């Protein structure tokens, strides 16, 4: 409100005073936000997938692998003769299950192929590990250690190193970070790592004299035998540590990946990770310093005060701030084990509640608690007397796995709404179900050569050559085929008996189908005992 005071001209004593009130609109201090545009809602698989009362069990044989714990061994021709097998590697299993739509079920009314399609749903998984608990050791015979930051008197003076221009590399080993990890999904797990970023051309953000490259966070699928983080970070050591002395032998020329949990959790359909369990433990065993030229990034002189005594002045050539620590995985105990125990899937972290659309599951794991490296010695000729040169020393690492699954048979109605949603999510699912999708008419007359591979015709197109529809054909996985290892007799398998006990489901003696009858005990009231008359 605005008030206006008005006075009439004339005698001031007899002046008339008038007050006018006027309303004025002012913009409000609050901002107005328009609602966002509506987006398509992502459905949970429980909204369009119906579960049945049929459960099946599938398990692998004993899966074994043997190799060198630090590097691949090749012969004179460059052919790999001994693979690299380390406890710090990822094990990425690609488990294939049979197509349930081709099953011959005893119950003919189980599903209608004209109106429904069958899919598998994971209800339980157990990853069993053999071999005793043990701590692995990794190291480098030429490790870049300039000084001991914990006890400097055991550093460069003991090694007679006087400046950065010398070679201060030593043979150093340590036990890596302790990691237990299990990721289960319908698609491969994703990992992240740091690598050299591409230089900006227009405009250039880096100067010509810049020595340190820019970093970029990259993401890729976790493949079998990829290295995990051992406590020195997830980065591409082959491009970011060119001296090959700042890391152990098993990762000095490798990429250490860390699971990209943020990206897999935020995935729209939740296929890459149904659930995950992990346990990581480490502490700083030793604190040291790396040697190297520091002219590019020298620590400022304003951060320290030099000595006034001429003989005690700080020698900057022997001082470096490139501190690092050697990790240690600490104690390994059976009470801390995540393996050799079942995991039951009731609700996934994403929208896919354990449905295997392409009849395959991806199991990614790391277990460093069984990292013992075997030392094998073989004599050269007659070894009647001991001499170091008379024995060959070898290193080997072994791993043992077994995977077991409980699968539930599920049905999807072939309604237009379901097919439209599934086609938007993954068109290859519709193709695997052998359902035709009407394509728009094409008025262009195409050419089809009969002898396309002969030298008389043109070269075939790349699309014609690529007949494989596998999206992961270029990735490396541990292939496991369980298409002929399915059984409905849950009470005859270890994981099946655990599942029956946990869920309270009873199995009929005919072993042809599984029923979900309740096993609750019925209590009876004992009748009152009458007192006999005397």
From Swiss-Prot:
Instruction: Provide ranges: composition bias, Polar residues.
Output: 507-521
Record's SUPFAM superfamilies? Group I dsDNA viruses
Q: Name one GO cellular component term.
A: T=7 icosahedral viral capsid
**Recorded GO MF terms:** structural molecule activity
Keywords noted in UniProt: Capsid protein, Disulfide bond, Host nucleus, Host-virus interaction, Late protein, T=7 icosahedral capsid protein, Viral attachment to host cell, Viral penetration into host cytoplasm, Virion, Virus endocytosis by host, Virus entry into host cell
Q: Which GO terms describe its biological process?
A: endocytosis involved in viral entry into host cell; virion attachment to host cell
Disordered, as annotated region: 507-534
Q: Where in the cell is it found?
A: Virion; Host nucleus
Subunit structure as annotated in this protein's UniProt entry: Self-assembles into homopentamers. The capsid has an icosahedral symmetry and consists of 72 capsomers, with each capsomer being a pentamer of L1. Interacts with the minor capsid protein L2; this interaction is necessary for viral genome encapsidation. Interacts with protein E2; this interaction enhances E2-dependent replication and transcription activation.
Q: Summarize the protein's role.
A: Forms an icosahedral capsid with a T=7 symmetry and a 50 nm diameter. The capsid is composed of 72 pentamers linked to each other by disulfide bonds and associated with L2 proteins. Binds to heparan sulfate proteoglycans on cell surface of basal layer keratinocytes to provide initial virion attachment. This binding mediates a conformational change in the virus capsid that facilitates efficient infection. The virion enters the host cell via endocytosis. During virus trafficking, L1 protein dissociates from the viral DNA and the genomic DNA is released to the host nucleus.
Per the record, the similarity remark reads: Belongs to the papillomaviridae L1 protein family.
Protein's UniProt name = Major capsid protein L1
Species this chain originates from? Human papillomavirus type 41
């Amino acid at each position: 409100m605005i008030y206006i005071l008005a006075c009439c001209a004339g005698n001031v004593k007899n002046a008339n005073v008038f007050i006018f009130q006027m309303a004025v609109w002012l913009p409000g201090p609050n901002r107005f936000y328009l609602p966002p545009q509506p987006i398509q809602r992502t459905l949970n698989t429980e909204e369009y997938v119906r579960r049945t009362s049929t459960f099946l069990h599938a398990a692998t044989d004993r899966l074994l692998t043997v190799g060198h714990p630090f590097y691949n061994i090749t012969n004179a021709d460059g052919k790999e003769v001994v693979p690299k097998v380390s406890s710090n590697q990822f094990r990425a299993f690609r488990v294939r299950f049979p197509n349930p739509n081709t099953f011959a079920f005893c119950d003919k009314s189980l599903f209608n192929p004209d109106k429904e399609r069958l899919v598998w749903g994971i209800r339980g998984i157990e990853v069993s590990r053999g071999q005793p608990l043990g701590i692995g050791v990794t190291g480098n015979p030429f490790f870049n250690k300039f000084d001991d930051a914990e006890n400097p008197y055991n550093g460069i003076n003991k090694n007679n190193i006087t400046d950065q221009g010398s070679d201060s590399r030593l043979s150093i080993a340590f036990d890596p970070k302790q990691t237990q990890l299990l990721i289960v999904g319908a698609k491969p797990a994703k990992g992240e790592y740091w690598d050299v970023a591409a230089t900006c051309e227009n405009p250039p953000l880096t100067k010509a004299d810049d020595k340190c490259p820019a970093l970029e966070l990259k993401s890729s699928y976790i493949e079998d035998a990829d290295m995990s983080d051992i406590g020195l970070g997830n980065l591409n050591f082959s491009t970011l540590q060119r001296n090959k002395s700042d890391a152990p032998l098993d990762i000095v020329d490798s990429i250490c990946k860390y699971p990209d949990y943020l990206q897999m959790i935020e995935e729209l359909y939740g296929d890459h990770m149904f659930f995950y369990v992990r346990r990581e433990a480490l502490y700083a065993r030793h604190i040291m310093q790396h040697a190297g030229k520091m002219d590019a990034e020298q620590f400022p002189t304003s951060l320290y005060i030099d000595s006034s005594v001429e003989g005690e002045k700080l020698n900057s050539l022997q001082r470096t701030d490139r501190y690092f620590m050697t990790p240690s995985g600490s104690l390994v105990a059976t009470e801390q084990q995540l393996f050799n125990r079942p995991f039951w899937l009731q609700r996934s972290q994403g929208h896919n509640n354990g449905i295997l659309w392409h009849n395959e599951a991806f199991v990614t794991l790391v277990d460093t608690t069984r990292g013992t490296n075997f030392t094998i010695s073989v004599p050269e000729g007659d070894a009647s007397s001991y001499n170091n040169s008379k024995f060959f020393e070898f290193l080997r690492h072994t791993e043992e796995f077994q995977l077991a699954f409980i699968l539930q048979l599920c049905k999807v109605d072939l309604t237009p709404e379901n097919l439209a949603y599934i086609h938007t999510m993954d068109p290859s699912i519709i193709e695997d179900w052998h359902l035709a999708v009407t394509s728009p008419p094409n008025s262009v007359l195409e050419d089809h050569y009969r002898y396309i591979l002969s030298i008389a015709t043109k070269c075939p197109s790349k699309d014609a050559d690529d007949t494989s529809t596998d999206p992961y054909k270029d990735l490396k996985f541990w292939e496991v085929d369980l298409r002929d290892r399915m059984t409905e007799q849950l009470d005859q398998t270890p994981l099946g008996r655990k599942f029956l006990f946990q869920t309270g489901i009873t199995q009929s003696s005919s072993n042809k189908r599984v029923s979900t009858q309740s096993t609750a005990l019925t209590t009876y009231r004992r009748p009152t005992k009458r007192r006999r008359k005397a």
